[in-house]
Swiss-Prot record:
Listed name of the protein: Probable Golgi transport protein 1
Classification via PANTHER family: CGI-141-RELATED/LIPASE CONTAINING PROTEIN, GOLGI TRANSPORT PROTEIN 1-RELATED
Function recorded in the entry: May be involved in fusion of ER-derived transport vesicles with the Golgi complex. Involved in regulating AMsh glial cell size, acting by modulating the E3 ubiquitin ligase rnf-145/RNF145, probably by mediating the translocation of rnf-145 from the cis-Golgi to the trans-Golgi during development.
Cytoplasmic side: 1-11, 55-70, 115-141
Keywords on record: Golgi apparatus, Membrane, Protein transport, Transmembrane, Transmembrane helix, Transport
Transmembrane intervals: 12-32, 34-54, 71-91, 94-114
Protein encoded by which gene: eas-1
Length: 141
């Protein structure tokens, strides 16, 4: 029998990751405020580490096939810290897409299955974008 309880460490990780996204979003809203973006990046990375562990985080970010995405992501963080938030965020976003692009179809399908959010995902402009990211399955499973 499998244990599906979420440990305290993973709960803290989810909270830190959520706060990281919130601070990054707030930093973008505040016209690319470097301090908020830096705090958000730090919280995001620490949260991911708490969720999957130190060893798996290092393996994930420094896997050979994901090295380009990692260099862009961490390089973008450094560029933000050095005071060029626009260029840093562009590099970070590109690196984020390269690193986490494999998870996008699963995330899109999850959003399509949530009752309140699914109606938003089927709006005309949003549906075309999401269909390119993750085409709908033709077969009911």
């Amino acid at each position: 029998m499998m244990n599906f309880e979420v440990s305290t460490t993973k709960q803290i990780g989810v909270g830190l990751t959520t706060f990281g996204f919130f601070f990054i979003f707030l930093g973008v809203l505040m016209f690319l405020d470097s301090a908020l973006l830096a705090i958000g990046n730090l919280l995001f990375i620490v949260g991911i580490t708490f969720i999957i562990g130190v060893q798996r985080t290092l393996v994930f970010f420094f896997e050979f096939r994901k090295l380009k995405g990692s260099i862009l992501f961490f390089g973008g963080i450094l560029v933000v810290l050095f005071g060029y938030p626009l260029f840093g965020m562009i590099a970070e976003c590109w690196g984020f897409i390269v690193l986490f692009g494999g998870f996008l179809p699963g995330i899109v399908n999850l959003l399509r299955s949530i009752p309140g959010i699914s109606t938003i995902t089927y709006l005309p402009g949003i549906r075309q974008v999401l269909d390119r990211l993750a085409p709908e399955s033709k077969y009911p499973v």
